[in-house]
Amino acid sequence: MTMGDSDLRKPTNFGTGHLSRRRSWCCSFAVPPASPDTRSISSRNHIPAKSQQQRPKLVPCSPQSSKSALNIVNRIDPRRILSPGRVSPIDSDPTVTTMQETETTQEEEDDAVVVDSTPNLRSESFRAPKIEVTGSGLSEGYDARLSLKGRNGGGVLVLELSLEVLAANSDVFSGLIAEEKKCSSSSSSLGLKNTCRIEVCDVENLGVFRETVELMFEESNVIIKKFMTMGVYRAIDVLEVAAGIKFSRAVLSCLKYLEAVPWTEDEEEKLRRLLGIYSFDDDAVSEILARFNSNETENLQDSLSKKLVWSITSCSDVNPRNELKSLVKGLLCKSSVYEKEQPEINKEDIYRAGKCCVDSLAKLFEEGSSSSSSKKEKPLIESISREVENINWLLEIMIDREIAEEFVEIWGKQRRLVEMHERVSPMVRYEVSRVTGAIFIAMGKRRVQCGGEARAGLVEAWFKPMLVDFGWLQRCKKGLDMREVEEGMGQTLLTLPVKEQYQVFMEWFRWFSKHGTECPNLSKAFQIWWRRSFLRGVESSTCR
């Protein structure tokens, strides 16, 4: 032990241990006390200067540096291993050795960051994508460079490919390669690498074009599996590119896939447009074309519509009848989303079905007026309600097709039905007024333009039954908007000649004064009629 050590071992001469420890750290030439921390320092200090100079700088993360770091960790006093956020009670002031180790560790971390960041920079740099060739017998090098330029500056994509594969799969690329080889003799004489360069401009979708080229390196059975992964919409895009570059294997595989899977309406329209642009082999595309409509189905549409209408009107079950009504109405109406230049529906078939429903309704009313048994009342009501629903359903189709004018005339001539209306029970007869209410609504909204004779016949026949049944209609609306019924009745009455308006409005006034809310409220139309008939008449006579 040296003299410096003996001097440091005399804490009692100074009174406290704190002063002796403070003295040991204040003196830069003093030797610290023996401890696990100072062993490495003493061993370091005894290393010759020559060996220190010849010691090479260790590369971070090398086995040698890891070993030295492990030795340092083993020499650390267990008391110095603290949890994060705690302050050590020992050696609160940093020592020279600690500072050196900290600087060395920081340098190693900086070097590690530099080394680790290098591969990231390389991976982010642009490299032309290559298509791997497996099992084709080709050399590992690529002798063709395909440059794809997107439409309207949509980017550039460069593919390094095999010249033999391109020429074998695409007739278009085969011709371009043949032209390029004619011009390659000059570059070969200059010692340049003989690489065929092909450029395709105005590419709509670079990703689809690349997927199509990648299929050249696959077997035919694998190509179909690729299409199954893509889906129908993407497969149609690939089919368009394959047809453009005359890649027959992909075209045949795609057509085979499309024929075997269902399509959405958007996919069907897209495929229909593509088949109209490119000409495909008849044998390959015949099964797909068979799924589209043909002339035979177009000729059968008229008779099919007739069969559907008659099937619905004769259906006795309520739930399927209502479901089919909604379906067929959506198909036959002009505003239908299914309409694709469909021909006009046969007007006579609709009118024939409507006339048949009206005749059935008249027979049911005759049966109800002559029947005295209460057992038949419930089936009779159900039958009458079904026929009324059929008439209203056909009327909606007629109104949408703008062919309802003649039906209004037919309904206004049902004198026999009007006569039986008075003899039938109110809970049965009000169903008929639902048809009259629907006609009044359509006329009030100007969706049906009838002649004066047809309007007069409708009001003459069905205005009084509407007054009688209005209370029942209010209680059993069945989808009928009573406000619209009142508005439609008032507007229709105002289209009649003034003399006829006088008789109708006076009749309404008497009914409304007796029955009140059980009668339709035509006050607004009555005021208009009053002003037209009297006030404006006085003004016109004064002007004369």
UniProtKB/Swiss-Prot annotation:
GO biological process: protein ubiquitination
Region annotation (Disordered) ranges: 34-66, 82-111
Comp. bias (Low complexity): 93-103
Source domain of life: Eukaryota
Pathway info: Protein modification; protein ubiquitination
Segments forming domain BTB: 142-225
Polar residues bias locations: 37-55
Keywords: Ubl conjugation pathway
Record remark: domains: The BTB/POZ domain mediates the interaction with some component of ubiquitin ligase complexes.
Stated role: May act as a substrate-specific adapter of an E3 ubiquitin-protein ligase complex (CUL3-RBX1-BTB) which mediates the ubiquitination and subsequent proteasomal degradation of target proteins.
Designated name of the protein: BTB/POZ domain-containing protein At2g13690
Natural source organism: Arabidopsis thaliana
